């Protein structure tokens, strides 16, 4: 989700030291927290709705398909919207749309129709997409260019804080409530949590509508002074988009299957509620890794760090597939630590030197987040065909590409 982002950005050379971007960055961390929280809550929603509607693995992965499919449909229009109305207004629009999506869970629970839940998730994800398109590049240009990747890694650490808290929140308010409910009332377990989230997004929208964050422009010269054309002309951006696709696909796929995997008798045999609490270790590892990475990657080469983490993730997945019991459990949970720097590192490397094409490039990268819709669906089909254990071979392919991008593909 890097040493510095290597850009030639004169925007900051004369003004960065004179401006205080601290308050704006602090406000943006709230958005990253909520984005991570709402996304990771799907990991709890999947086993819950799987039980409510008696779904197989492939059908339950439609939750991620609809959520991350929104990135594919909304990202490019969102990039144009943000470029037209400013980063701040884009953030406000994203928050409002996300609030509406959360509110739609109330009628979905009342009618107890799986398709309505999927529709609500799509609307919610559309709002989150707009937030991602506006917030990610905004962070990279709020401050010195040589520390852009470090700032993005730090804000992503708060995204990870949200993903760490979400499983516990979901375990208590969704899975535990569903355990005590009748079959007909199980779907209602999501109403109160998502009502709270709708209110939270609404409050944040009001706050950002009132705030006056610094207005910065994307006036850096692009690599080779390519003022014409589009962001698609940059090879490292295109390969980076593939990197985002496979990274998000792998991360979402692993996270989506954790509750069911840890509930498997051959692994840990945990109850779904206990398994959900353990999911916090996976996302907590990513949080810790991002805080460490925010400081360490000021001194470490971006690409080499990315490749190293990808290789370790591959080793951990092989251990997960080849073993059972607590070794398999802790191996898969440890992957979160090495996922930590991947998204911000790929993102910052891919946006290097895009200049006036930065908004479009950000939209393309967010478009690639559709990997979170496709890869889990494939792993779901594998889980139905060969079992949930062997299905963890799928993310290995994704991490292999990430290693390639870190060593070779990111060179511009």
UniProtKB/Swiss-Prot annotation:
What is the protein's major site of localization? membrane
An example of a GO molecular function for this protein is: galactose transmembrane transporter activity
Q: Which InterPro entries match?
A: Glc/Gal_transptr_bac, MFS, MFS_trans_sf, MFS_TsgA-like
Gene Ontology biological process terms in this record: D-glucose transmembrane transport
Parts of the chain that traverse the membrane: 21-41, 62-82, 90-110, 113-133, 158-178, 192-212, 239-259, 310-330, 331-351, 363-383, 388-408
Q: Say if the entry is tagged with keyword Nucleotidyltransferase.
A: no
Show the GO cellular component annotation of the record: plasma membrane
The answer to whether UniProt assigns keyword Cell membrane to this entry is yes
Query: The organism sits in which domain of life?
Result: Bacteria
Tell where it localizes. Answer: Cell inner membrane
Membrane topology according to the record: Multi-pass membrane protein
Q: Which UniProt keywords apply?
A: Cell inner membrane, Cell membrane, Membrane, Sugar transport, Transmembrane, Transmembrane helix, Transport
Which family, according to the similarity comment? Belongs to the major facilitator superfamily. FHS transporter (TC 2.A.1.7) family.
What does the record give as the function of this protein? Intake of glucose and galactose.
NCBIfam families in the cross-refs: gluP
- Name the record gives this protein: Glucose/galactose transporter
What species is this protein from?
A: Brucella melitensis biotype 1 (strain ATCC 23456 / CCUG 17765 / NCTC 10094 / 16M)
The gene it comes from is gluP
């Amino acid at each position: 989700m890097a040493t510095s982002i290597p850009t030639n950005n004169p925007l900051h050379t004369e003004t960065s030291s004179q401006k205080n971007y601290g308050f704006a960055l602090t406000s943006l961390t709230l958005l990253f927290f909520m984005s991570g929280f709402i996304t990771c809550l799907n990991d709890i929603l999947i086993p819950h709705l799987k039980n409510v509607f008696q779904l197989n693995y492939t059908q339950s992965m439609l939750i991620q398909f609809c959520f991350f499919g929104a990135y594919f449909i909304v990202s490019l229009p969102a990039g144009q919207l943000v470029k037209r109305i400013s980063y701040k207004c884009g953030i406000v629009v994203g928050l409002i749309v996300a609030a509406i999506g959360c509110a739609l869970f109330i009628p979905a629970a009342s009618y107890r129709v799986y398709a309505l839940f999927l529709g609500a998730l799509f609307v919610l994800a559309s709002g989150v997409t707009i937030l991602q398109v506006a917030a990610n590049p905004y962070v990279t240009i709020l401050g010195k260019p040589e520390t852009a990747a470090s700032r993005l890694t730090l804000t992503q650490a708060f995204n990870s804080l949200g993903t760490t808290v979400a499983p516990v929140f979901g375990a208590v308010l969704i899975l535990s409530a569903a355990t005590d409910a009748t079959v007909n009332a199980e779907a209602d377990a999501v109403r109160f949590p998502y009502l709270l989230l709708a209110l939270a997004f609404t409050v944040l929208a009001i706050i950002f509508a009132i705030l006056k964050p610094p207005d910065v422009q994307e006036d850096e010269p692009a690599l080779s002074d390519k003022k014409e054309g589009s962001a698609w002309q940059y090879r490292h951006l295109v390969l980076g988009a593939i990197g985002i696709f496979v990274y998000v696909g792998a991360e979402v796929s692993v996270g989506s299957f954790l509750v069911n995997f840890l509930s498997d008798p051959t692994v840990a045999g945990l109850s779904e509620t206990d398994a959900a609490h353990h999911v916090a270790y996976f996302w907590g590892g990513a949080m810790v890794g991002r805080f460490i990475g925010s400081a360490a990657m000021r001194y470490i080469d971006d690409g080499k760090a990315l490749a190293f983490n990808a290789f370790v993730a591959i080793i951990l997945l092989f251990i997960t597939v080849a073993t059972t019991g607590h070794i398999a459990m802790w191996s898969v949970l440890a992957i979160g630590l090495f996922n930590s720097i991947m998204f911000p590192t790929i993102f910052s490397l891919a946006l290097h030197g895009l200049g006036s094409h930065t908004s479009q490039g950000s939209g393309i990268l967010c478009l690639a987040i559709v990997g979170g819709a496709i890869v889990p669906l494939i792993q779901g089909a594998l889980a139905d065909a060969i079992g949930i254990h062997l299905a963890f071979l799928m993310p290995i392919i994704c991490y292999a590409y990430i290693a390639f991008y870190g060593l070779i593909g990111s060179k511009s």
